Structure formats: structure tokens, C-alpha cells
Amino acid sequence: NISEKNHERCGEVAKALLGKNGYGLMFSLNLYSKDQNLATQCFEINEIYQDLGLPRSQKYKIRVSPAFPIVGDQENITLPIRDYPKVGRIMVDLLKEYPQLCFRFDCSFPPCFLDEIQEDEYPLVERIFYHGNQPVPNIQDWETSDLYLGCADDSPMDIDPQGDCFNCFPFHNLKLGNITDFKQINDLSIKKMHTKFLGHAFSAEPNEPCKSCPHYMVRCSSGCFAYNFA
């Protein structure tokens, strides 16, 4: 927020919305930099839940999204993939500090976020969700399970301010249409990327550090494909 007054107002609005609609509403944070004050952001969100009396036995989720490149004309600040482990280290520390906190990724979960995790912290990863609602399995099970944490079809539909629809927000050049093109919300929700998008996405070679990463093409598809086109 651009001012302390606006920041305070956002907190007031959040409390009012949660008070009316229940704990199911989700805060959303973009991950722009390893130096952003993620700890303060999570502290303030946790305080709101505690002030509203969230039962100790109940968890809450914060939606997080790394700031990806946008393919095409738009430029935006992105979180470099080389910084994913540093940001992941901060997130693991926050999971330890706030036992009710969970993190939710809409689409892929790049496993390099956990490159700096310690073995005694492995159980914490089950409070990280990917593809919307899938809990990340304990790291000890990764080698023996059929696990894919990368880009997936059926991801949530993104709609930009102009009403243009995307299965993958960074690929603005591959929009599915405009909300005015769909007669019903069900028609919009079942529109999928399928092979056209994935064939295009895999056409670009991965960049470093993904190209040399041991996770690549084992359980990860190089984070967000948009990095390979940027």
C-alpha cells in the first residue's frame, strides 16, 4: 500500500470481510523479492485471524504466487528462480512460527523452494499446497512416489481487468477469449489449455538454473514456463 493509512484501512476491511464471511476467505500475497518483508505480512495476517478467534485446531491458508514474467508486451517485476530457495527458507521459518498457517500455490510448486530445508523440518511441507488443493508430500517420499509438481492443465482461470481469460496468466498471448464470449460460468470453467498450450510451452529450452537442476523433468517442469520465453 502507498501509505500507512491505506495499510490500516486494508486491515479493517479484511477483518470486516472475515467477520461476515467466515475463515474460508483467503489472503493473497505475490512473491516479488527475497528481500520483501514477508514475515511482517504473515504476522499481520495471523494477527487478524487470532483477533477474530480462529480456533487453535483450525488452519488457514495464504495464497502465494511467485511474480512470473508475462510473455508478450507487458513488463513486470519478477522473482528470479535463483532466489526461490531463499524465499522458501523464509516460508519454512514462518510455518514453524505460525502453526496454523498454510501456503497455497494455485499451479505449480517449484521444489527448489525447499532446497534449504533441514531434515527435521520435512513434515512442515505438508502444509504447502499446490495445484490448488494438493498437499506437498513429505520430502522423504519424493523418490518413491509418482510425484509431479509442475505446470498442470485444469489450473484456475485467470481474468484480467479487460475481461480476457487465461488458463495461464503469464501467457497473455495465448488467451482463451473474453468473458463476453461465454454464455455461462460453466462454459468458462471447463475451457482448458490441453495439448495446444503444453506443446507450445515445451517448445522452449529451459534456462539456467533449471536446465541443470536435479528436479527438472523428474518432478518439475522448470517452474513457470514463462521464464523460458522471457
Spans of features found by a protein language model:
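Short cysteine/histidine-rich metal-coordination sites, predominantly Zn2+-binding motifs
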Residues: A226-A230
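Residues embedded in well-ordered secondary-structure elements
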Residues: A16, D146-Y148, F202
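C-terminal accessory region of radical SAM enzymes
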Residues: P85-Q140, D164-C220
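Radical SAM/AdoMet-radical enzyme domain recognition
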Residues: N1-K86
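Short, small/polar residue-rich loop motifs at catalytic or cofactor-binding pockets
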Residues: L149-D154
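Residues that scaffold the ATP/ADP-binding catalytic core of kinase and kinase-like folds
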Residues: G223
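Short, acidic, Ser/Thr-enriched surface-loop or helix-capping motifs
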Residues: I159-D160
